[in-house]
């Protein structure tokens, strides 16, 4: 018998569990980093940092409004670093993940985990109270029958 089946007002245990799992999965997918587009096989279209050594000229920083509109590398994360390729001496921009962004994502994840833990702790407490009431009712009926 399903948890809560046959009793009005109690949520179906499995349905609630699936709902929470789906919510958590959706939350994790929303926070997942965006994968870069698949690049073509020709090396002429590849950024120089994929095929040769490079040096970071400017550290990872947030894109300005203008740069976000004009530089496609700002799209995936909103942060970009300027690099200089060693052999070709080309200056290019590369999308990057900043420590601030990673910290923000970490705390969002931690908050979601704490919320899910609190929800399940409440469910455990509610179920324990139901079982205690059932046990007390059985004991009461046994005492009355004596």
Swiss-Prot record:
This is Protein JTB. Induction: Protein levels increase during the S phase of the cell cycle, are highest during G2 and mitosis, and decrease to low levels at G1. Levels are lowest at the transition from G1 to S phase. It is found in: Membrane; Mitochondrion; Cytoplasm; Cytoplasm, Cytoskeleton, Microtubule organizing center, Centrosome. Interacts with AURKA, AURKB, BIRC5 and INCENP. May be a component of the CPC at least composed of BIRC5/survivin, CDCA8/borealin, INCENP and AURKB/Aurora-B. GO terms for cellular component: centrosome; cytoplasm; membrane; midbody; mitochondrion; plasma membrane; spindle. Required for normal cytokinesis during mitosis. Plays a role in the regulation of cell proliferation. May be a component of the chromosomal passenger complex (CPC), a complex that acts as a key regulator of mitosis. The CPC complex has essential functions at the centromere in ensuring correct chromosome alignment and segregation and is required for chromatin-induced microtubule stabilization and spindle assembly. Increases AURKB activity. Inhibits apoptosis induced by TGFB1. Overexpression induces swelling of mitochondria and reduces mitochondrial membrane potential. It comes from Homo sapiens (Human). Ubiquitous. Expressed in all normal human tissues studied but overexpressed or underexpressed in many of their malignant counterparts. Pfam families: JTB. The chain crosses the membrane at residues 106-126.
């Amino acid at each position: 018998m399903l948890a809560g089946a046959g009793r009005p007002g109690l949520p179906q245990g499995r349905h609630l569990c699936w709902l929470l799992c789906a919510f958590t999965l959706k939350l994790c997918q929303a926070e997942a980093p965006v994968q870069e587009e698949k690049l073509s096989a020709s090396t002429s279209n590849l950024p120089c940092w994929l095929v040769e050594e490079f040096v970071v000229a400017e550290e990872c920083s947030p894109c300005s409004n203008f740069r976000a509109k004009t530089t496609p590398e700002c799209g995936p994360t909103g942060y970009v670093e300027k690099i200089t390729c060693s052999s070709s001496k080309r200056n290019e921009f590369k999308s990057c993940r900043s420590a601030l962004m990673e910290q923000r994502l970490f705390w969002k994840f931690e908050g979601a985990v704490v919320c899910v833990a609190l929800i399940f702790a409440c469910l455990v407490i509610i179920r324990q109270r139901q079982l205690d009431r059932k046990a007390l009712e059985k004991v009461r009926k046994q005492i009355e029958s004596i």
